[in-house]
Amino acid sequence: MIDPRLQEILPQLASAAAHTHALGFQLEGVEGRRVRMRVPYREDLVGDPETGVLAGGLVTALLDHVGGMAVWVAMNRFATVATLDLRVDYMRAAEPRKDLLAEAECFRLTRSVAFVRAWAFDETTADPVAAAQAAYMLDSDGGRGPGANLKGEES
């Protein structure tokens, strides 16, 4: 079960960063370790004005962010995470003038790294726009502050 404090702040975390707020990221829901987010279609997010298809960079940003949120859900707390590796396979263009959705699930959590799979889609996960696999570095300082894990440092 997800910690009620985390559940309360997840919607704000979906769009707390300047870029996620500007792009309109929204939390759709959490089920188990799976997180779903949405970016409502807007003309200013289009990558190709002739087709109305959303920009590829938007897809990447959404997959990265929903992946990080899946890590928080798996850890059942908010903590600093940093993307170590993000591989995105684009399978098709997003449908013109449709919202973009993404789901992510943290499938392995170690002391220092979390591993995530994610999908971006416009209608169903069975027909993804893109799929991603990512690794995120976890804040492993145990609350001791920056540099606490450096060899020879005293906390």
Indicate residue ranges for each PLM-predicted region.
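Active-site helix/loop of acyl-thioester processing domains in fatty-acid/polyketide metabolism
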Residues: 54-77
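Catalytic strand-loop segment that frames the active site of acyl-thioester-processing enzymes
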Residues: 24-54
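HotDog/MaoC-like acyl-thioester-processing domains
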Residues: 1-4, 94-97, 101, 105-155
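N-terminal structural module
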Residues: 10-32
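Hydrophobic beta-strand-centered segment that forms part of the acyl-chain substrate-binding groove
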Residues: 70-101, 106
